Every structure is written in C-alpha cells, then in structure tokens.
Amino acid sequence: MDAGSSRSLENAVNRIYHDQLVPKINTSKKMSTLAHPPNILEMSQEIKKNCGGKQVEITLERTKMTKGIKEKQSNDLEKAAFKRKAEGEEKPTRKKQAKITELDNQLITMPLPHIPLKNIMDVEMKLVYIDEMGVRYEFVESFMSTGSQPTCQAAEIVDPLSVHNFSFLPQIDKWLQVALKDASSCYRQKKYALAAGQFRTALELCSKGAVLGEPFDAPAEDIASVASFIETKLVTCYLRMRKPDLALNHAHRSIVLNPAYFRNHLRQATVFRCLERYSEAARSAMIADYMFWLGGGREESISKLIKLYWQAMIEEAITRAESFSVMYTPFATKIRADKIEKVKDAFTKTHPAYAEYMYTDLQALHMLPQTVDWSSFPPQQYLLTLGFKNKDDGKFLEKISSRKLPIFTEHKTPFGLTREDTVRQMETMGKRILPILDFIRSTQLNGSFPASSGVMEKLQYASLLSQLQRVKEQSQVINQAMAELATIPYLQDISQQEAELLQSLMADAMDTLEGRRNNNERVWNMIQKVGQIEDFLYQLEDSFLKTKKLRTARRQKTKMKRLQTVQQR
C-alpha cells in the first residue's frame, strides 16, 4: 500500500474515532528473588470537549460496567479470602515456581525457567488466532445487559450472517457484511494480502457510516465494537504475512476502540513479541490477564495461558537487557528504610557488576505472573530493585519518580534546542529512558497518573520525532499512547481532574494524528514546559543558596583574619 492510500486510510479510521467515539526464547540470564510473603496543570477544557469527550465518556461508561463486575467478584471472594488468612498466611503456595524464604535469610539465586518457543506459539494459536473460520465482532455491553458471563469467546461472538439467532445483537450494514464475508473467505484460503485489502475496504465503509443497519440510532459503543473487530482482523492478517510493523498501529487502534476486551491486549502483546519489544509485550499480556478477570472470565485454563505468555515476555526482557539487572522482593508489610537497605545489600552481593547505581521503585508495587491472583486482597506484591552498570543509565529514575510533572531534559537551555540537541535528546529518550520505563511497567499494573504512567514520556518523545519530521514513528508512538490512555480508567480509579487531563491528552493526540493545528499548544508540551520552568527555578534557588553560603564563609574568614591581626598587634 502506497503512502498516499495509507494516509487516507489512517484519516478514515481517525474520523471513526472523532465522529463516533470521541476518543526463539532464550532464558539464560538470572533473576534474583528475595522473599518474605509479603497540583496537575490547570487548563481550560472547553476547546477539547467536542474533540475528545465521547471517547472518555465511553471509556468511563465501560469502566463503571466492569467495576461493577469487579465489586461483585470481590464480594463473593471476600469471605474465602479472610478465611484463608485466618487459617494462616504462612501456608506455601503449591504452584509457585520460585522458592520463598525469609528476607533476613540467605538470598536464593536461580536461573529463570526456560519456556520453549513452541509453548508461546501454542498460546498465540489458542488465544490470538482463534475463531478464524467466522466473521465475528465485539459487543461487550450486550452480554452485560443479558446477564450472561463472557466465556473464552466472550466478545468475538457471532457471524453476521447468523446474527438473527441473537436478537439482542445489532444488525450490521449489509454492504459491510458482504465486505467482511469476502475478507473472511480470503483469510480462510490463506490469501492474507487479499484479506487485508478487504478488511481495509470494510474499515473505509465504517468511516462513511456504513456500520450498523440503523446508523442514526446506533450507539457509538456498538460502532466502536465493529471497527475494533476489523482492526483486530487486520492485525491477524499482517501477523500471518509476517509484517508485524504493519500490524502495530491496528493493534493500538483496536484497544482505543474497545479497551475492555482482553484479546485486543493479547494481540498487541503478540505484535510486540514479533518486533522483539518484550517489555511492552509483557505489559500487554499482564493487562490482558487482568481484563479477562475483570470482564468475568472464569476459565482458569485461559488465565494460565495468558500468565505463561506474560512470564515468558518478562524473562526474555530480562535476558535481553544489557545495561541493568533486576531483583523482585516479595513482602506483605510496610516498607521500612532498613529493609530497603537490606535489599540493596543483597542485590550488591548477587549482582556486583550492576551495583554502580541502584534504584528501588517505591512509587507502585509490582506483581509477577507466577504468583498473581487478581481476586485476592491484595495480590502478592513485590518491591522492584534495578541495578545499573553505568550510573548515567539509571540516575534519571530518581528525578522522574520524585515529581508530579513527568519531564526529562539534559540541556541547560531546553527551550532553544538545536537540531543536534533534539537528535541527542530523542536518542536518549528512545534508547535509554523509555526501554527502562517500559520494563518497570511490565509488572506494574497501575502506577499513578500521569506521573508514573509512562504515557506523558511517550507523547513528549513523539514531539521530538515530530520536530525531526519522523512522521511514521511519531504516528506509532501516539497511537500507542492513545491505547494506554484508553486503558487507564480500567486499571485504576481516577479523579475528576485526572479525567479532564486524560480527555485533553486524548483529544490532542487525535488532533496530532489527523494533522490538525490550532493556536493552543499540545497538553504534554505545556506540562513539559512547566516542569522545565520548575527545574530552572530550582537551579536558580540552588545557585543562590550556594553563592550565599560561599559569601557568608568568605565574610566569616575575613572577619577571623581581622580579629587575628588585632590580637597580634
């Protein structure tokens, strides 16, 4: 597909968002486990409401629905949880793969278990490429309204040609139905390029309003579900064609359109795996497992497969990491300073080559697939410690984690960067900062928004790419950030102020993708400038205090010399 038609298709898909929604595994490296069971920037929103409001409304509406399920599950499991605690929390978990010892005891170092590539491919065949014989699409709310619980095919539910057997489901447009049938036929014949072309045609029909039989009365969420299904089919087509780079944006868009469906996140994880972006694949798999539970999924076999995939991606990310090593410390009590020092001492003994700089993440707790149970109160949690060979590779973490406004700059004049400075900062962000943040978030479900969500850094990275006119990369980063923004309300409770910020970020991201320009600066750039001004003021304050201290010391020294001179006389 040439650049012109690609741009046209992207604009068509963005119009759907705007008009209808708006918004070979190697495990030779070792990982250590320690054990003991264990004011946002104010801004006017009026300009953004018409652009980004509907996506946030849909996201919040779906969040309420899934939160209701979560509360019901929590109530059902609460008694059992307290009973287990009363019987004794010291009882070992039977299926844990890592041996657990007391924190004060000897640290155990063990090789990561090898997960064969065949096992990973089996998970993908069972959960990612499933239901290829039928044209199916996603209507989450329909299942909720009928009171039935989603099964392993929860959201991919019905062939449009047999939709009359499910009277509670909307009827899709007949021309769109024909396009989807042709695409499905090509796919079954393994003509993946032709199938992708047909699915792109179907996507263009969606952008023109040909989605459901009653377009004027169709809920935006149902339209989003159909478009999300088409995006997922494009993902599988490109994966079959071994072109994960073409599948990536479609995987992101399917999540923007329907963030509640766990398979969308698992497909995104598969794309990341094919691109060897293992930390991001691990996070997507973690979210997929959580969404499966949150949506009422009760088939333990599916959750085990997702957790296996999540575990394999974490292990591969650790194996591929060259600049740092990692240690997870299970705990159940309050984190004390002396415990952190013990963890760092243990890390130094175990990984002396990575002790140049150590960082312990206190912003949020971490979970591992070997022990996580979303229905427990709370799940087994871990303290993450990273150690670096080079001090410069990790010292930025302290700065990012200690501020409310996430910004990064290494220049004394951040407001007037030359092209060389921009290239240098872009490479630093893309090769050194973002990969580490992505790894941290691969076991962290819900960091605070926006400080430790990682979204703001990605959007600021996209701005650097834009300044260097790297449009294709910028588009991918923004699409990924939008997928993460759409998922945030499902992972954590957000305040009204945070919801407004999320809405503005989503609207600005969509405007950027569509090439829209206005007189207002992008929200993430405004936040970055505020942070840079803060840094500048702090530097002035530090400089003033240092100068004052030196001046006082000189005066005191001069005074003492005068006294000595007088005494000598």
UniProtKB/Swiss-Prot annotation:
Q: Which UniProt keywords apply?
A: Cytoplasmic vesicle, Developmental protein, Differentiation, Disease variant, Golgi apparatus, Spermatogenesis
Write one Pfam family the protein is assigned to: NYD-SP12_N
A Gene Ontology annotation in the biological process aspect, one of them, is:
spermatid development
What Gene Ontology terms describe where this protein resides (cellular component)? acrosomal vesicle; Golgi apparatus
Judging by the UniProt lineage, the source's domain of life is: Eukaryota
Q: What is its subcellular localisation?
A: Golgi apparatus; Cytoplasmic vesicle, Secretory vesicle, Acrosome
Q: Which Gene3D superfamilies match?
A: Tetratricopeptide repeat domain
Q: Extract the ranges annotated as region (Disordered).
A: 67-96
Tissues with expression: Expressed in testis.
For bias type Basic and acidic residues, the affected ranges are 67-92
Task: Summarize the protein's role.
Answer: Essential for spermiogenesis and male fertility. Involved in the formation of sperm acrosome during spermatogenesis.
Matching entries from PANTHER family are given as:
SPERMATOGENESIS-ASSOCIATED PROTEIN 16 (PTHR47228:SF1)
Misc: Association analysis reveals significant frequency of a synonymous (Ser-225) sequence polymorphism among clinical groups with different sperm traits: the donor group, which has the highest sperm count and motility level, has a significant higher polymorphism frequency compared to normal and asthenozoopermia groups.
| Associated disease | Spermatogenic failure 6: An infertility disorder caused by spermatogenesis defects. The most prominent feature is the malformation of the acrosome, which can be totally absent in most severe cases. Additional features are an abnormal nuclear shape and abnormal arrangement of the mitochondria of the spermatozoon.
Q: Which family does it belong to?
A: Belongs to the SPATA16 family.
Q: What is this protein called?
A: Spermatogenesis-associated protein 16
Gene that specifies this protein: SPATA16
